[in-house]
């Protein structure tokens, strides 16, 4: 069987359970298949995950963010291979990971959630250095996720600086 011809659903090969699970997780439980602004909806998916991780305490929450990023790298890389397109818009687990990094170590107040969401979306779109370089030059799961992690780091710093001046 040739891997060059798309099969059912446009995937590059027939999918086993692990493949289907990877695509399902990478697309944010199929949220990424929403035709308008899938990245925005994928970012929203990160909010309930943040609340779940907050229940683990500070150290557990940070460990949970790291574990989620590693999971995102794994499933995004596998999904990208199956879909056959670099950083396909339907892959949104990276947006959720970026929001988790944005809010890591911060109280989950309505202000932080709204400002963090907005800051992350802006940083994800602008892709400040080195995010754009990572997005262009890295391949596989790390290439899909790492630019969003960088955007999340910038957004986290922005929120911390903003809160030190405002509150």
Regions found by a protein language model. Give the residues of each.
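Interhelical loop and helix-boundary elements at the membrane-water interface
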Residues: 2-44, 74-102, 122-153
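Aromatic-rich, lipid-facing transmembrane alpha helices and their immediate juxtamembrane interface loops
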Residues: 47, 105-106, 140, 163
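Alpha-helical transmembrane segments of multi-pass membrane proteins
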Residues: 51, 66-74, 98-99, 103-104, ...
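Transmembrane helix interruption/hinge and helix-loop junction motifs
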Residues: 53-60, 105-112
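Alpha-helical transmembrane segments and their juxtamembrane interface "caps"
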Residues: 56-73, 90-93, 115, 123, ...
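Juxtamembrane boundary at the C-terminal end of a transmembrane helix
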Residues: 159-167
């Amino acid at each position: 069987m040739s891997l060059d011809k798309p099969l059912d659903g446009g995937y590059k090969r027939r999918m086993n359970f692990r493949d289907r699970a990877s695509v399902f997780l990478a697309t944010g439980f199929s949220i990424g298949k929403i035709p308008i602004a899938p990245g925005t909806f994928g970012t929203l998916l990160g909010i309930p995950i943040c609340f779940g991780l907050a229940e683990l305490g500070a150290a557990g929450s940070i460990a949970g963010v790291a574990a989620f990023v590693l999971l995102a790298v794994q499933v995004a890389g596998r999904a990208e291979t199956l879909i056959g397109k670099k950083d396909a818009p339907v892959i949104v687990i990276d947006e959720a990971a970026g929001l988790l990094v944005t809010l890591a170590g911060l109280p989950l107040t309505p202000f932080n959630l709204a400002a963090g969401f907005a800051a992350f979306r802006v940083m994800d779109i602008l892709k400040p250095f080195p995010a754009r370089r990572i997005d262009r030059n890295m391949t596989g799961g790390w290439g899909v996720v790492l630019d969003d992690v960088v955007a999340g780091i910038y957004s986290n710093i922005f929120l911390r600086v903003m809160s030190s001046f405002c509150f």
